[in-house]
Amino acid sequence: MNAAVVRRTQEALGKVIRRPPLTEKLLSKPPFRYLHDIITEVIRMTGFMKGLYTDAEMKSDNVKDKDAKISFLQKAIDVVVMVSGEPLLAKPARIVAGHEPERTNELLQIIGKCCLNKLSSDDAVRRVLAGEKGEVKGRASLTSRSQELDNKNVREEESRVHKNTEDRGDAEIKERSTSRDRKQKEELKEDRKPREKDKDKEKAKENGGNRHREGERERAKARARPDNERQKDRGNRERDRDSERKKETERKSEGGKEKERLRDRDRERDRDKGKDRDRRRVKNGEHSWDLDREKNREHDKPEKKSASSGEMSKKLSDGTFKDSKAETETEISTRASKSLTTKTSKRRSKNSVEGRKEDNISAKSLDSIVSGINNEPNQETTTSEIGTKEANINSTSISDDNSASLRCENIQPNPTEKQKGDSTSDAEGDAGPAGQDKSEVPETPEIPNELSSNIRRIPRPGSARPAPPRVKRQDSMEALQMDRSGSGKTVSNVITESHNSDNEEDDQFVVEAAPQLSEMSEIEMVTAVELEEEEKHGGLVKKILETKKDYEKLQQSPKPGEKERSLFESAWKKEKDIVSKEIEKLRTSIQTLCKSALPLGKIMDYIQEDVDAMQNELQMWHSENRQHAEALQQEQRITDCAVEPLKAELAELEQLIKDQQDKICAVKANILKNEEKIQKMVYSINLTSRR
């Protein structure tokens, strides 16, 4: 991302909006939520694109679906193209996916220019809401015959590419068993083909466009389109091409997903088969047989490698394994003779009893293995393994008939040899699935049955998730250790045929007196009990057993001289218990005292501080009371001085009121007297008039 583009965006939009912040980090790869906030802020601040979105779309929480985001951005792009008249190459789907930050910044720059130039967007909003797509004004319609032919050719090629991709997807699903290298090569070739076709299309379109332009220039110069319209046409073409490529990539991704699902199913089936085989082998004691078989294979490698892959396939198809039987029988007999001559007389004497037991165990384990092989008809095995199995079956049948002529001797392998065997088996298990086809027969037939599923397993594609962690299988070692708990010898898996007579066998072996069965059983029982106690008992059980032993010792009958001592000890223990209880009580009381002393001391400290504060406050209030009392007295003196003349005036007024009241009373008395006189005079006049 160029820093100059971000700077231009900051200059254009920084004058229009203040938030969200136009930082270089956000503008270099703008997320949709950031673009949504910018557009809503532009609408709120300037009114540009007002009415384009509903109230629900203005809230970013409602625009979470991919289609909703694409439609949101498409509306904004259409309005900006209509208002500005400039072509925009930004694709909403690419913007939502986080691609094309430069074109996204170009969109933001044009929005800022429209807002700064105060261009009206009402007409464009109306047209976009009516369903019209954003196009540059004055764009000439491409109605020439050459352009139509180009479009037809493009459509035909698109249909061919679509059919080819579908056919390829079907073929890839059918051929999912091929190796990763071949698939990668085929996919590279198939990816190159549509690219080359796209290049041819672009060249053909450019040639057709050039011819068309030259013809138009010669026919009519007035119809010449401006540069911006040509750029818009190119942008639309590129947009169509991008959409086509997206569709193709989506189809390919869908096909790849189907392939991955099928591969995962095959892998799960192989894993389940491998687990079932492991369980059967653990049950039947086949792990020890596999270890011995791997040791035997190390001797058989040069002879088995000489057999060609064609002969092996013929043997497998026809079912004739006579040559392999003969070879395995001869190898078994030679190995048995070598092992018999190299054994010492001491080991023979020690294993004389154990060998008889182990003969039965080996026969049983081989029978179980044969039954397990018959139960798995779909299991793929190499010719060498089949030959050894048949040889073992023949040897078991011979051992049933001639049990006296068969002997098995075992030597306990060293731990270094065990580690080597494990490491080699792990290495073979890891190197199994590396680039092998089904049609090819493996050169090393020593691969065990566990690896047959790994060979048939399809390699993981590069786009797959990381594989789960591998669990290290230690079942074989655990099974061996459980089998060897009674004795330190392993059970031999090869039952050799001896064509010699009984006398020759007696000459080869040195027979010694075997220990009695009762002694052997006692030794085995003691070792088994000790092992079980060591393995089963944990720390708690051991402590319980120790306490039980101590208790049993205490319950034994005491001696006569120890009675007094025991009484003294019991009395001493009682006194000790009483003293310890009193000490414990004292300790608890001291602890409670200490616990209460600390908060008490803190309270006392706080009380002292509070008392000082209260005394200071009391003095303050006393002084304030004194001041207020003095002020009150001063005010009283002032009021007294001011009220004295008023009091004198009041006294005068009261005196005047009394005088006036006296005058009124005197006037009333005169009026009453005059009325009496008038009445008397009227009465006297009436009397005189009557006369």
From Swiss-Prot:
Stretches of the chain forming a coiled coil according to its record: 571-666
UniProt entry keywords in alphabetical sequence: Cell projection, Ciliopathy, Cilium, Cilium biogenesis/degradation, Coiled coil, Cytoplasm, Cytoskeleton, Disease variant, Leber congenital amaurosis, Nephronophthisis, Phosphoprotein, Senior-Loken syndrome
Substitution effect: V125M: In SLSN9; results in altered folding of the N-terminus; does not localize to the ciliary tip and transition zone; does not affect interaction with IFT20; loss of interaction with MAP4
Subcellular location: Cytoplasm, Cytoskeleton; Cell projection, Cilium; Cytoplasm, Cytoskeleton, Cilium axoneme; Cytoplasm, Cytoskeleton, Cilium basal body
Biased composition (Low complexity): 391-405
GO CC terms: axoneme; centrosome; ciliary basal body; ciliary base; ciliary tip; ciliary transition zone; cilium; fibrillar center
Highest taxon of source: Eukaryota
Chain intervals with Polar residues compositional bias: 331-343, 371-386, 487-498
BP GO annotations: cilium assembly; defense response to virus; embryonic camera-type eye development; embryonic digit morphogenesis; embryonic heart tube development; intraciliary anterograde transport; intraciliary transport; kidney development
Renumbered residue ranges of the record's region DISC1-interaction domain: 223-691
Pfam families: MIP-T3 (PF10243), MIP-T3_C (PF17749)
GO MF annotation: an example: microtubule binding
Region (Disordered): 136-508
Region: Abolishes microtubules-binding when missing, residue numbers: 1-323
UniProt biased composition (Basic and acidic residues): 147-328, 351-361
Post-translational modification Phosphoserine, affected residues: S317, S476
Chief place of localization: cytoplasm
Family matches, as Gene3D superfamilies: Microtubule-binding protein MIP-T3
Tissue-specific expression: Ubiquitous.
Subunit-level organization: Component of the IFT complex B, at least composed of IFT20, IFT22, IFT25, IFT27, IFT46, IFT52, TRAF3IP1/IFT54, IFT57, IFT74, IFT80, IFT81, and IFT88. Interacts with IFT88. Interacts with IL13RA1. Binds to microtubules, TRAF3 and DISC1. Interacts with MAP4.
Involvement in disease: Senior-Loken syndrome 9: A renal-retinal disorder characterized by progressive wasting of the filtering unit of the kidney (nephronophthisis), with or without medullary cystic renal disease, and progressive eye disease. Typically this disorder becomes apparent during the first year of life.
Family the entry assigns: Belongs to the TRAF3IP1 family.
Function: Plays an inhibitory role on IL13 signaling by binding to IL13RA1. Involved in suppression of IL13-induced STAT6 phosphorylation, transcriptional activity and DNA-binding. Recruits TRAF3 and DISC1 to the microtubules. Involved in kidney development and epithelial morphogenesis. Involved in the regulation of microtubule cytoskeleton organization. Is a negative regulator of microtubule stability, acting through the control of MAP4 levels. Involved in ciliogenesis.
UniProt cross-references to PANTHER family, sorted A to Z: TRAF3-INTERACTING PROTEIN 1
Protein name: TRAF3-interacting protein 1
